[in-house]
Swiss-Prot record:
Biological classification of the source: Eukaryota, Metazoa, Chordata, Craniata, Vertebrata
Source organism superkingdom: Eukaryota
Record-given protein name: Spexin
Organism: Homo sapiens (Human)
A GO cellular component entry from the record: transport vesicle
Transmembrane segments: none
Length: 116
């Protein structure tokens, strides 16, 4: 009888150990293990927790998929430094009389009357 009880207890203990090991193998091994989330689950997680759950790989992919920023002027003939310097100096050397000749006060008078 005593041998039968110890055999049953040993069998039950081994069974419980194997069941525990079998169930623990499907548990996440790491705290932040990457999972395959469905799109609906991702939308839920984004709404509930912000963008914390998006994986680093998808962030890197988003950055690599973006188009490169374009230049402001699509003109392929850019000014050289000496050309830009001469244009700047010419604009700085304009006399104040030339600017006053181009100044049209009637335009401002019409605008102020319209906005009155």
């Amino acid at each position: 009888m005593k041998g039968l009880r110890s055999l049953a207890a040993t069998t039950l203990a081994l069974f419980l150990v194997f069941v525990f090991l079998g169930n623990s193998s499907c548990a996440p091994q790491r705290l932040l293990e990457r999972r395959n989330w469905t799109p609906q689950a991702m939308l839920y997680l984004k709404g509930a927790q912000g963008r914390r759950f998006i994986s680093d790989q998808s962030r890197r992919k988003d950055l690599s998929d973006r188009p490169l920023p374009e230049r402001r002027s699509p003109n392929p003939q850019l000014l050289t430094i000496p050309e830009a310097a001469t244009i700047l100096l010419a604009s700085l050397q304009k006399s104040p009389e030339d600017e006053e000749k181009n100044f049209d006060q009637t335009r401002f008078l019409e605008d102020s009357l319209l906005n009155w």
